[in-house]
Amino acid sequence: MNIVLQIFCCLIAAEFAYIFYLETVIPDSGTTAKVFGMDVKDLKMPAMKTAMENQGVYNLGIAVLLILAVFVLHSKDAVAGLLAYIICVALYGSFTVSKTIILKQGGLAIIALILCFFRAVLQLMRNNAGIYGHIAGYIEDKR
């Protein structure tokens, strides 16, 4: 797997681990309130605190799965699937919460998914005989 894609996946996993930290470890802090644009007093409500902590565990799960897909499974398909899921969730959040979520939570994932597709296209071109194979080989050699 491409080192650039691995770096992007690590950054995405770190972002989701940080969200876990905010939502589960310090769910009613001033930092969490600032990041999510909420009042601390609202975050201290037991139902809200429980919901935040639960959501944080899901975010940690995404981070762990992404790291496993990259470094244990070495699966481009699993990575692409997780990135697509992250983008879908960010898109949903941009419609329901704030339009900027697609860039804040999904921006790195969008770039990483584009890298996945670019790499797949180059691999297909390289596997084909003829001019496309030579072009892809040339591009790969220049990296």
Q: What kind of feature is each model-predicted range?
A:
Residues 3, 43-46, 50-53, 73-77, ...:
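Juxtamembrane loop-transmembrane helix junctions in multi-pass integral membrane proteins
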Residues 3-27:
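N-terminal signal-anchor transmembrane alpha helix
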Residues 5-8, 30, 69, 77-78:
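A charge-rich, low-complexity, intrinsically flexible signal that marks solvent-exposed coils, linkers
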Residues 15-18, 22, 34-71, 84:
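Core segments of alpha-helical transmembrane spans in multipass integral membrane proteins
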Residues 22-32, 72, 96-99, 103, ...:
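Juxtamembrane transmembrane-helix termini
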Residues 67-91, 95-107:
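Transmembrane helix-loop-helix
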Residues 108-120:
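Small-residue-rich segments of transmembrane alpha-helices in multi-pass membrane proteins
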Residues 127-128, 134, 138-141:
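Intrinsic-disorder-associated, low-complexity terminal segments enriched in Asp/Asn/His/Tyr and depleted
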